[in-house]
Swiss-Prot record:
<dbReference type="GO" id="GO:0070043">
    <property type="term" value="F:rRNA (guanine-N7-)-methyltransferase activity"/>
</dbReference>
<keyword id="KW-0808">Transferase</keyword>
<feature type="binding site">
    <location>
        <position position="68"/>
    </location>
    <ligand>
        <name>S-adenosyl-L-methionine</name>
    </ligand>
</feature>
<comment type="function">
    <text>Specifically methylates the N7 position of guanine in position 527 of 16S rRNA.</text>
</comment>
<keyword id="KW-0949">S-adenosyl-L-methionine</keyword>
<comment type="similarity">
    <text>Belongs to the methyltransferase superfamily. RNA methyltransferase RsmG family.</text>
</comment>
<dbReference type="InterPro" id="IPR029063">
    <property type="entry name" value="SAM-dependent_MTases_sf"/>
</dbReference>
<dbReference type="InterPro" id="IPR003682">
    <property type="entry name" value="rRNA_ssu_MeTfrase_G"/>
</dbReference>
<keyword id="KW-0489">Methyltransferase</keyword>
<dbReference type="Pfam" id="PF02527">
    <property type="entry name" value="GidB"/>
</dbReference>
<feature type="binding site">
    <location>
        <position position="125"/>
    </location>
    <ligand>
        <name>S-adenosyl-L-methionine</name>
    </ligand>
</feature>
<keyword id="KW-0963">Cytoplasm</keyword>
<protein>
    <recommendedName>
        <fullName>Ribosomal RNA small subunit methyltransferase G</fullName>
        <ecNumber>2.1.1.170</ecNumber>
    </recommendedName>
</protein>
<feature type="binding site">
    <location>
        <position position="63"/>
    </location>
    <ligand>
        <name>S-adenosyl-L-methionine</name>
    </ligand>
</feature>
<dbReference type="GO" id="GO:0005829">
    <property type="term" value="C:cytosol"/>
</dbReference>
<keyword id="KW-0698">rRNA processing</keyword>
<feature type="binding site">
    <location>
        <begin position="112"/>
        <end position="113"/>
    </location>
    <ligand>
        <name>S-adenosyl-L-methionine</name>
    </ligand>
</feature>
Length: 192
């Protein structure tokens, strides 16, 4: 189990309450995950911290939605987080949620394909297949790696992506779900 300081747990509990409150008016998370919120959403996001060696980085979270994993990682100590979300209603929520963190959070209300930004690490959760992710981020420069929370079809996604892209990857077991995996991707290059 992960050791999480009390101050961070308190902030994550405030974030949890905010998500539940806003979820009544805009669909941030599935209603059937509310009963298991801490494990399904908070811990699922928080587990990425074990693959972030240096917290003094710029992390970009695409398709941020309810702020998983971006807001959680900021609360846990990542110095600068940019959240990219096309839905204005979700961006308004993310703006409110960003106040919980002591760190720098930037909300970008645009389609991912239009965003030009540099970062050390790129994350996403419940967004899309690998090929779609890689195609969407053509204007985003990822210096270090991708940390992608994936489900049971992760191997098929890797095989399909390898037809169009060269990349190195590690597969880590999720601590929250037997079928869940964390793909750590680096050295991404499109095959011409």
């Amino acid at each position: 189990m992960m050791e999480v300081p009390r101050e961070i747990i308190e902030k994550l509990e405030i974030f949890q309450k905010l998500v539940k409150k806003w979820n009544k008016s805009i669909n941030l998370v599935s209603d059937n995950t509310i009963h298991n919120f801490w494990q399904r959403h908070i811990l699922d996001s928080l587990q990425l911290m074990q693959y972030i060696d240096n917290k003094e980085i710029h992390l970009v979270d695409i398709g941020s939605g309810a702020g998983f994993p971006g807001i959680v990682l900021s609360i846990a100590g990542v110095a600068k987080v940019s959240l990219i979300e096309a839905d204005l209603r979700k961006c308004i929520f993310l703006e409110k949620a960003s106040k919980i963190s002591n760190n720098n959070i930037q909300i970008i209300n645009q389609r991912i394909e239009k965003v030009e930004i540099d970062c050390s690490i790129l994350t996403c959760r419940a967004f899309s297949k690998l090929n779609t992710i890689f195609n969407c981020i053509k204007n985003i420069s990822v210096q270090e790696k991708f940390l992608l929370l994936k489900g049971k079809n992760y191997l098929t996604e890797i095989v399909e992506a390898k037809e169009m892209w060269l990349f190195d990857y590690l597969i880590h077991q999720s601590i929250t779900c037997e079928e869940g995996k964390i793909l750590e991707v680096s050295n991404l290059t499109k095959i011409i």
